[in-house]
């Protein structure tokens, strides 16, 4: 199985003492896929707190070990359609989460996230590495 790793999983891995279940799961991945949206979210979070070492680690990790999936027209279209339908049904979803869900859908990946509730209405496969 292949996974699109959500921002909160990358954030957990960068902690001094990450959750043991997440670490074990993450260490077993042959390929680490994440969305370009995750890159933006990580850079934003680390830059805002001026965490230079973690930013350097993430940059190196991204270049050496990860496959970053770009947002293209198909992903944008699917995201907009799903987010629009969810909004019309009274369900609020962020653009970032919608684009991440669309990226998982487009590439046929399971979305690994702690926040499964945020993605449950997209009809994509989900896994929470924080659970056993």
Residue ranges and their predicted role:
Residues 114:
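Conserved acidic donor-binding loop of glycosyltransferase catalytic domains
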Residues 2-3, 20-106, 110, 120-124, ...:
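PIN-domain endoribonuclease scaffold, especially VapC-family toxins
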């Amino acid at each position: 199985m292949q996974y699109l790793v959500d921002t909160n999983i990358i954030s957990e891995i960068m902690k001094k003492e990450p959750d043991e279940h997440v670490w074990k799961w993450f260490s077993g991945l042959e390929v680490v896929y994440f969305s370009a949206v995750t890159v933006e979210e990580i850079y934003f979070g680390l830059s805002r707190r001026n965490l230079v070492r973690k930013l350097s680690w993430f940059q190196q990790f991204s270049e050496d070990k990860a496959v970053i999936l770009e947002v293209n027209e198909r992903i944008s279209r699917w995201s907009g359609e799903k987010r629009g339908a969810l909004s019309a049904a009274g369900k609020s979803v962020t653009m970032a989460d919608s684009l991440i869900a669309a990226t998982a859908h487009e590439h046929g990946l399971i979305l690994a996230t702690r926040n499964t509730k945020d993605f449950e209405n997209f009809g994509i496969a989900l896994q929470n590495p924080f659970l056993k």
